[in-house]
Amino acid sequence: MRRAWILLTLGLVACVSAESRAELTSDKDMYLDNSSIEEASGVYPIDDDDYASASGSGADEDVESPELTTSRPLPKILLTSAAPKVETTTLNIQNKIPAQTKSPEETDKEKVHLSDSERKMDPAEEDTNVYTEKHSDSLFKRTEVLAAVIAGGVIGFLFAIFLILLLVYRMRKKDEGSYDLGERKPSSAAYQKAPTKEFYA
């Protein structure tokens, strides 16, 4: 039983140390020391253009509307008495997708306002209108995060109670003196007291 507890404890320590080691290595990978960049080998020059432009900035970008071209063969069936022939022609369809001029936040706001006004006008069709809402900015207002935090707290609390009960059990067992440490107590006959009388010649 004692071996099982030792193995369980070693397993838990290994898991915790592996997680902390993974967090430390990921932090080292994410942040670089600027002073060591000049000393490192194989360093490329810093391109300032990449830092000035960001995803979705749209200030210097030329927006091209993509043209989709699809071709489908259309069979022409001419009925003749001798042999049926199938001739195919190609139909070209060009679709132009207009470029979006509004930001996604503005379009989301418009959808929310439109759906609110539609809900006021026609309350019978509430279930058919589906739109997306932005999630709240606070992390603890989300139900799944709150449930995970509560579950983690309960598990941690139960583990702490288990450790305290184990400690109390071990202390009581130690007070009783029932530990078998694998050491044999020498019998009283093994060590006999030498006579304390001294003889002087």
UniProtKB/Swiss-Prot annotation:
PROSITE patterns referenced in this protein's UniProt entry, alphabetically: SYNDECAN
Cytoplasmic side of membrane: 170-201
Keyword set includes ATP-binding: no
Residues listed as glycosylation sites in the UniProt record: 41, 55, 57, 101
Residue ranges, annotated region (Disordered): 42-70, 90-130, 178-201
The organism's place on the tree of life at top rank: Eukaryota
InterPro entries for this protein: Neurexin-like (IPR003585), Syndecan (IPR001050), Syndecan/Neurexin_dom (IPR027789), Syndecan_CS (IPR030479)
Function, as annotated: Cell surface proteoglycan which regulates dendritic arbor morphogenesis.
Similarity comment text for this entry: Belongs to the syndecan proteoglycan family.
Name this polypeptide is given: Syndecan-2
Species of the source: Homo sapiens (Human)
